[in-house]
Amino acid sequence: HLAALGALAGDGLLVPVETSVKGVEALVGVMEAAQEYREALEQVDPRVPRSFVRLFIPTKFDARTLGDNRVLEKIAGLEDLAPVASPIAYRPGPHRRATERAVPLQLVGDRQAREEVERLTEEFLQRVVAQDAAREGVLEEVAE
């Protein structure tokens, strides 16, 4: 219940999707939950976006494998529901160290890992936050 309350308190979900068959299969449950969150929010605010998912983030991506590339193509097909970020590469060492130390990846990762986090942040700002600002501007104009 805590996850649901947290989601409802926010503006939507950033959904990490592992670039594996299991990752795509897990999306079914995530999308069902996101729809429930959206319906609950719609009762309070009818201006809720069509999708409660704000950004799909492909994770654990290994560009060298055919399987990961195929799954990434499937994830890209979700663009109609929400923007899809560039994939986050599979880096077991830095990710494990960050988890073990309970610190952000930027503190234990290499330059490439830090650049990926910066790129993801920039994509979020451009594709989600800017879109929200534009939509809010349109809604404010309609209200006037």
Q: Which residues does each predicted region cover?
A:
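Beta-strand-loop-alpha "switch" segments that mediate conformational coupling across diverse proteins
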Residues: 51, 60-103
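Structural beta-sheet core signal
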Residues: 15, 55-58
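Short, charged, surface-exposed secondary-structure boundary motifs
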Residues: 23-29
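C-terminal boundary of histidine-terminating zinc-finger modules
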Residues: 96-118
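Inter-motif core of Ras-like GTPase G domains
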Residues: 3-21
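Short mixed-charge
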Residues: 36-51
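C-terminal alpha-helix
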Residues: 33, 119-131
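Short glycine-/polar-rich loops that comprise or flank the Walker A/P-loop
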Residues: 9-12, 49-54, 80-82
